[in-house]
UniProtKB/Swiss-Prot annotation:
GO terms for cellular component: plasma membrane. Residues 599-613, 710-735, 791-807 are cytoplasmic. L-glutamate binds at residues 151, 172-174, 222, 301, 389. The chain crosses the membrane at residues 578-598, 614-634, 689-709, 736-756, 770-790, 808-828. This is Metabotropic glutamate receptor 3. Keywords: Cell membrane, Disulfide bond, G-protein coupled receptor, Glycoprotein, Membrane, Receptor, Signal, Transducer, Transmembrane, Transmembrane helix.
Length: 879
């Protein structure tokens, strides 16, 4: 049944194209190379290019055709001379032309299966006596096939050869389809599949940030599957396809000129990715030259490093990036090929045509009106460059030879010749047990490293290694320069790349955003965006997102992250500090001077009469208020913050408790004199001190409880409108600080009330009058301070300075209104600081260890009558 299936397939194939390829047609003129051997390898090469119109074949393909064909012959010669590889076994060849067409290649490949059919049905050729009939044109039995070149050719041929279990090794077919072992189970290749190349091309685009490109593919398996693999890799890297074009020979496809026009419709897609056969690439570049179009081409190995593709259109291809399979030139082949000429190469029937085409001459007189070829013409370095896949052709032939060698050693261990077990090859065994398992160092490779190993993976594919070339103009000469390589990862020498406009081209749907802008992607298109500036306090988390650094942080110069802003606070050298500190120092010195004067003249009548105990307490409070400036200017810390909260209210409490005690005493004394009451209680100096300390203690207790409930500390504070500034402040609200002064306000109000009540005392009693001046002025200062404090809350410098100056002014008011007159008399009018006469009090006298209101001390200057009662003034009438 199996034999009938093969016969039916072969018969259908033969008759579908007529009898030109049948066994009995002797009129069909076929160009082929047949060299007999013990084992014969088939060969398929694009010796000629595609024909135009109705012609099957066109001009000679000098590089990919003739060179590759001769590479196979060269490899066969070397193997046959090798004493270690297949010794005693001669390899033969049967080489056919594919004309760069898959259908034509399939017709040619039928020759390879004729021998298999003959062996299968050999009984039909036996004579009645048991002998075999004499046959003409007996086909050679093919052990394996080397080829084809184009993926479309290899796919068609592989579908045929698998039916007859003939192994096939391609040296150039890279379509990913051929890795499918369920369909191409006798196919192997010394080159990698296209998805490696597609990945390399996508990485090149990503490397240069080309995210918006056009693509052009050749019709057929190579171009279509290759560009499909590229599109998958591009999507993974957020690369968008502006337009995808396809070219081919069929009438439904666009012409090359129309493809160029379509590409020009996408002006932002300056990079064009080509996955095309060499002939299609040449035509497209020529069309671009006609349209004077300028693109940056990124091309697959279909273009590679071929001079023929860009010939005549070099200016259009300038700056192109092309890929070629990584290979080493076979120098022995160079010597072999350069030794060939039409007079010594008779086994190659296409060589004469190649010679005439290459040198534009004729080997026969008056042929095509060409000049006669000079017999001294030769192939040399001036007119020859080794084609890039010669190494892969040689490796393919050697791979088949190594597999046959191991099979022969296994099946025929006692001989170097072919034994009966190999007379009819088991192609399945050869492929699976030997070919896929070969592992040898590439012949003629000077580098004995990992890259020189020839082996196949489980899919029969070669290793993925590519060279990256740049087409450039150096010194007026165009050439390809290797600028990198790809072997799972990309490596490029960017400095060696020449661009058509002397700078790396851009190929993006939208212009690049500024360093401080993010991309706002357009719906449905990951490559087109609108640039939106980030706020000054935002950094770029990625190219699509601006992220808030958060309070207290600021983006770095390159917007890649954030850093902690330095803490801002008033420093001693700031102008905002110098003014308040100067005022506070002046006030503190004045306070110290007053204290010094009072201590020095402590026992003089004026000091005694002033209530010196309360005066010292009052002066201590004034001095403490000046010290508060230093606490508010100092860098905030838990200790400083505690001192601020404790000292501000306490300093005022000390001052106004002393004043309240004094005004209350005066008021009670005059009320007692006025009403004729008994001597008021608690008017002795010690009583007044205890009353004053009690009032102060209330404030201290309140602040202490506050400190316990809300522990002092610092916080980093940022205003919404000034995010770039981080203010180091105490962790207490401004409102809380003012609330803590509530008790002091009560003291001020009470002092003011008592000062107002004693305003009608005799005019010679000036103590009450000056206390009144002090309290009125203090109220004015505080009424002006409160709104200023709240209005300046947005600027901590102004607020702090206002606070310091207001506190200092309160101290100056006390010094100026209460103590300045006394100091003036003590220092400049000492004659008034004496006892001038005695005032007798009928109702009561006040006495104590310190200040005395009694008959012994009532002989002060000027007796005073208040509402008909005589009282003692604690100051003098001339103040």
């Amino acid at each position: 049944m199996k034999m009938l299936t093969r016969l039916q397939v072969l018969t259908l194939a033969l008759f579908s194209k007529g009898f030109l390829l049948s066994l009995g047609d002797h009129n069909f003129l076929r160009r082929e190379i047949k060299i007999e051997g013990d084992l014969v390898l088939g060969g398929l090469f694009p010796i000629k290019e595609k024909g135009t119109g109705t012609e099957e074949c066109g001009r000679i393909n000098e590089d990919r055709g003739i060179q590759r064909l001769e590479a196979m012959l060269f490899a066969i010669d070397e193997i046959n001379k090798d004493d270690y590889l297949l010794p005693g076994v001669k390899l033969g060849v049967h080489i056919l032309d594919t004309c760069s067409r898959d259908t034509y290649a399939l017709e040619q490949s039928l020759e390879f299966v004729r021998a298999s059919l003959t062996k299968v049905d050999e009984a039909e050729y036996m004579c009645p006596d048991g002998s075999y009939a004499i046959q003409e044109n007996i086909p050679l039995l093919i052990a394996g096939v080397i080829g084809g070149s184009y993926s479309s050719v290899s796919i068609q041929v592989a579908n045929l050869l698998r039916l007859f279990q003939i192994p096939q090794i391609s040296y150039a077919s890279t379509s990913a389809k051929l890795s499918d072992k369920s369909r191409y189970d006798y196919f192997a290749r010394t080159v990698p599949p296209d998805f490696y190349q597609a990945k390399a091309m996508a990485e090149i685009l990503r490397f240069f940030n080309w995210t918006y490109v056009s693509t052009v593919a050749s019709e057929g398996d190579y171009g279509e599957t290759g560009i499909e693999a590229f599109e998958q890799e591009a999507r993974l890297r957020n690369i968008c396809i502006a337009t995808a074009e396809k070219v081919g020979r069929s009438n439904i496809r666009k012409s090359y000129d129309s493809v160029i026009r379509e590409l020009l419709q996408k002006p932002n897609a300056r990079v064009v990715v080509l996955f095309m056969r060499s002939d299609d690439s040449r035509e497209l570049i020529a069309a671009a030259s006609r349209a004077n179009a300028s693109f940056t081409w990124v091309a697959s190995d279909g273009w590679g490093a071929q001079e023929s593709i860009i010939k005549g259109s070099e200016h259009v291809a300038y700056g192109a990036i092309t890929l070629e399979l990584a290979s080493q030139p076979v120098r022995q082949f160079d010597r072999y090929f350069q030794s060939l000429n039409p007079y010594n190469n008779h086994r190659n029937p296409w060589f004469r045509d190649f010679w005439e085409q290459k040198f534009q001459c004729s080997l026969q007189n008056k042929r095509n009106h060409r000049r006669v070829c000079d017999k001294h013409l030769a192939i040399d370095s001036s007119n020859y460059e080794q084609e890039s896949k010669i190494m892969f052709v040689v490796n393919a032939v050697y791979a088949m030879a190594h597999a046959l060698h191991k099979m022969q050693r296994t099946l025929c261990p006692n001989t170097t010749k072919l034994c009966d077990a190999m007379k009819i090859l088991d192609g399945k065994k050869l492929y699976k047990d030997y070919l896929l398992k070969i592992n040898f160092t590439a012949p003629f490779n000077p580098n004995k490293d990992a890259d020189s190993i020839v082996k196949f993976d489980t899919f029969g594919d070669g290793m993925g290694r590519y060279n990256v070339f740049n087409f450039q103009n150096v010194g007026g000469k165009y050439s390809y320069l290797k600028v990198g390589h790809w072997a799972e990862t990309l490596s490029l020498d960017v400095n060696s790349i020449h661009w058509s406009r002397n700078s790396v081209p851009t190929s993006q749907c939208s212009d690049p955003c500024a360093p401080n802008e993010m991309k706002n992607m357009q719906p449905g298109d990951v490559c087109c965006w609108i640039c939106i500036p980030c706020e000054s306090y935002e950094y770029l988390a990625d190219e699509f997102t601006c992220m808030d650094c958060g309070p207290g942080q600021w983006p770095t110069a390159d917007l890649t992250g954030c850093y902690d802003l330095p803490e801002d606070y008033i420093r001693w050298e700031d102008a905002w500090a110098i003014g308040p500190v100067t005022i506070a120092c002046l006030g503190f010195m004045c306070t110290c001077m007053v204290i010094t004067v009072f201590i020095k003249h402590n026992n003089t009548p004026l000091v005694k009469a002033s209530g010196r105990e309360l005066c010292y307490i009052l002066l201590f409070g004034v001095g403490l208020s000046y010290c508060m400036t230093f606490f508010f200017i100092a860098k905030p810390s838990p200790v400083i913050c505690a001192l601020r909260r404790l000292g501000l209210g306490s300093s005022f409490a000390i001052c106004y408790s002393a004043l309240l005690t004094k005004t209350n005493c005066i008021a009670r004394i005059f009320d007692g004199v006025k009403n004729g009451a008994q001597r008021p209680k608690f008017i002795s100096p010690s009583s007044q001190v205890f009353i004053c300390l009690g009032l102060i203690l209330v404030q201290i207790v309140m602040v202490s409880v506050w400190l316990i409930l809300e522990a002092p500390g610092t916080r980093r504070y940022t205003l919404a409108e000034k995010r770039e500034t981080v203010i180091l402040k105490c962790n207490v609200k401004d409102s809380s600080m003012l609330i803590s002064l509530t008790y002091d306000v009560i003291l001020v109000i009470l002092c003011t009330v008592y000062a107002f009540k004693t305003r009608k005392c005799p005019e010679n009693f000036n103590e009450a009058k000056f206390i009144g001046f002090t309290m009125y002025t203090t109220c004015i200062i505080w009424l002006a301070f409160l709104p200023i404090f709240y209005v300046t809350s947005s600027d901590y410098r102004v607020q702090t300075t206002t606070m310091c100056i207001s506190v200092s002014l309160s101290g100056f008011v006390v010094l100026g209104c209460l103590f300045a007159p006394k100091v003036h008399i003590i220092l400049f009018q000492p004659q008034k600081n004496v006892v001038t006469h005695r005032l007798h009090l009928n109702r009561f006298s006040v006495s104590g260890t310190g200040t005395t209101y009694s008959q012994s001390s009532a002989s002060m200057y000027v007796p005073t009558v208040c509402n008909g009662r005589e009282v003692l003034d604690s100051t003098t009438s001339s103040l």
